[in-house]
């Protein structure tokens, strides 16, 4: 039986913003997001697409019209759960007390999550810090909307994927040119790994690094990697949030962030690749870029360690 796992706010943010041609939220078997707070709290605001968990005779009801056996991600949140441990709660009724004045009480999200683990094939995630922490960081993903029509989910515009929490995002050219996204994510610097240019970046010489390479296996990204890492580090020290982007946000920009993680953490291509793949499911650098990342690994670690002949790459 699958168990409970804690889900960091950045993980839920990335789950909500996965996309292929359309947002993954269009797939009814992709995400079941459940809010176990009170009705008035839910009505005041909740995370987009979240369903309110109802009670009858003081018992939680299962969500309607959701096949939990088929759902890939089942995420539950309350106000502020931050641990999977059972909490001690003061007991004011001396007659039922065991003498220490406290009872063992699971928080609402954990209590409901345990019920769901009997019905799912995948782990049930408890949002760490609950709604309070998530909405404090990603306020733009709050809503009062309760019912989402299929065409509304089709039209949902995902945000860039968060790679280094609060510091580095990866996206596409369209997202990079969207003023609302720049404002919501507090983007202050850009790394453009494409041939595309636009008026949005005019006059931004100190805040824009443009690596002009084609989307082809012959494109050479290796000569730019050291300068790119230096550019990102400078903006980290300045406290700037950085968006790395390419035309589709799948190949060149992902190769760039993998290279940065290898440099920043002094780690293998394999480890950096796995981390970015977990954050951004449709990541797919072309074979030419993968070969250059192996060369970059040799530069960073003194040897080529990752086997890029593995089908993973």
From Swiss-Prot:
Belongs to the protein-tyrosine phosphatase family. Non-receptor class subfamily. Pfam families: DSPc, Rhodanese. Residues 159-302 form the Tyrosine-protein phosphatase domain. SUPFAM superfamilies: (Phosphotyrosine protein) phosphatases II, Rhodanese/Cell cycle control phosphatase. The keyword Mitochondrion applies. One of its GO terms (cellular component) is mitochondrial matrix. Interacts with G3BP1. Interacts with PTPMT1; the interaction inhibits PTPMT1 catalytic activity. Residues 27-138 form the Rhodanese domain. This is Serine/threonine/tyrosine-interacting-like protein 1. Catalytically inactive phosphatase. By binding to G3BP1, inhibits the formation of G3BP1-induced stress granules. Does not act by protecting the dephosphorylation of G3BP1 at 'Ser-149'. Inhibits PTPMT1 phosphatase activity. By inhibiting PTPMT1, positively regulates intrinsic apoptosis. May play a role in the formation of neurites during neuronal development. GO terms for molecular function: phosphatase inhibitor activity; protein phosphatase binding; pseudophosphatase activity. PANTHER family: SERINE/THREONINE/TYROSINE-INTERACTING-LIKE PROTEIN 1 (PTHR46659), SERINE_THREONINE_TYROSINE-INTERACTING-LIKE PROTEIN 1 (PTHR46659:SF1). The keyword Metal-binding does not apply. Its main location: mitochondrion. The gene is STYXL1. It is found in: Mitochondrion matrix. Keywords: Mitochondrion. SMART domains: DSPc (SM00195), RHOD (SM00450). One of its GO terms (biological process) is intracellular signal transduction. It comes from the Eukaryota. It comes from Homo sapiens (Human).
